């Protein structure tokens, strides 16, 4: 059975940031390799989420219904990681880290992670030092 990789998106998410990761997960990390993971989208609610590019995405799960058994959490960057909506993700990230899950964050989501102290003791990259 394939393990789920949960992609957290917020309104005005950067639709290009998760595309390459999701494609590799769906096709196998290397061409011809076994497909072990499946990407799933998580958002604050089950309502459609609009990307920066105008795509409307229907989440597979909302924050309240997402499974607890998953392989990794990926926070996709975007324009709303400083919003009250983003604050709802703090307990999800905290729980994932406490349970030893892999957590990735791209672009402004990395700044969100830094703001909440999640990056204090790990090597990481981000947009600019001023944002971290």
Model regions: which residues?
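Short, hydrophobic beta-strand segments that form beta-sheet elements in well-ordered domains
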Residues: 40-43, 103-107, 123-127
């Amino acid at each position: 059975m394939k393990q789920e990789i949960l992609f957290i998106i917020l309104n005005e998410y950067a639709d290009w940031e998760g595309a390459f990761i999701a494609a590799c997960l769906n096709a196998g990390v290397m061409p011809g390799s076994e497909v072990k993971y499946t990407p799933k989208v998580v958002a604050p609610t089950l309502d459609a989420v609009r990307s920066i590019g105008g795509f409307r995405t229907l989440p597979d799960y909302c924050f309240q219904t997402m499974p607890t058994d998953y392989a990794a959490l990926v926070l996709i960057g975007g324009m709303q990681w400083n919003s009250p909506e983003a604050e709802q993700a703090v307990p999800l990230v905290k729980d994932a880290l406490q349970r030893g899950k892999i957590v990735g964050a791209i672009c402004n989501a990395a700044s969100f992670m830094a703001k909440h102290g999640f990056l204090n003791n790990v090597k990481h990259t981000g947009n600019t030092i001023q944002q971290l």
